Amino acid sequence: MWVYLPGDVHPTLCGRFNNDRTAAGGVGKFVYAKSYLSQSHARSIDPVLLPLRDGEHSTTAQLGFFGVFVDASPDDWGRGVIDLMYGKPDSPVGYLLRSQGDRVGNLDFSEAPDVPPVQRGLPGRDVLKAAVGVLAGIERGRKEDPSLENWVRPNTAMGGARPKLTIADEAFQWLAKFPSRHDDPEVSVARLEHALHALARHCGIETVDSELIMVDGADLLLVKRFDRTAVKKEDGLTAWSRDGFVSARTVLRSSGVNENSYTGSYPGLARDLTRWSAKPVADKRELFSRMVFNCVVSNTDDHDRNHGFVADEMGEGFRLSGAYDMVPRIPTTQRRVQAMRVGDDAQPTRDNILSECESFDLSKAQAGEIHDSIQATVRQNWRECFDHSGLSEAAMEKFASCFPPSLKQVLSQAVRTGLADVEGGDSGSQEGRPGGG
């Protein structure tokens, strides 16, 4: 296992990871290399579960994979590409070895300590037109021209199920997110996500930078990589340093989705930030704001791999990364729940959101003020953000139930309710009626 130390553009041998299959799942064992431990600038890859020390670290969680290794592994999309192009690996470790180039964070892997990971160049924006058809074909199980391997193979390690490709220009790396055959044909997911980035920024929430482009009739969302920094070499070419990354799942030491349970907990994550964050007070407040925002906009896919932390410049601690993967989900039942536990449960009600505000170092009054401000900002701006992202009036009406009703709608509903009470001859409480209580 290799790591890119702060500012470095080449990996340093960090240690050895073995994963053995067992009847119960798997056992993972990791040992830091003595050469790594002897370096004054060595950094722990997980300060909680893998502190810098000699000796063996072991785990049986997640089939014997430490969370930081799961974060660096390909997800549904990448695994599917690897299976299609190279055949299914004999073990999950094979996915770590066969995915190259674009994995999130600063870890990398090879088969032996004297064989550094392959550093493949990334394609530029000029491949995007061809990529629309290529990735659509891969999603349908069609193998592509072997000549395209040089830009498909380095793009298998990023998480999620959507077709994607990491590209690079002279200044930044971008994660290009493509349409999926599973998308609603009437709504552009790229435009939806771009609109929510803008809406979150209206609410004072830090988000990833994104750019919406159209290529060959397809909407693509380019998301700037927050874990890569361009470094100019002496020959004028661009190399890339890499920053460490951990998901909320790793911070929470969770094994992921379990039947009849939530995929993480916002209050629990806030409490764990004390050990992980370089600035826990600021990160807890930001996390609370994101929790409120996700509840208010019906982003119910806010599971613990859709929140991340990136190492600070010195690699000494972590900070919340910019918010990402936010899309409203049209409710299908009257009872709405978030993927992560919000307060006492996962319901996105104001009372529940405020029920564990002390975990975020906030008073009830402070938490209530943040909630009400975000709700009002969303109510006032969501249609404008949809419009600026090129979403139609029909799309707005389709997703209107995801957002707080306008004040006009609230007042109209109140008037209708009041009239119904009068017409029904309700003899109950006189509160709220002319001349009443």
Model-derived segments and their meaning:
Residues 1-304, 308-437:
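Phosphate/dinucleotide-binding and metal-coordinating scaffold of catalytic cores
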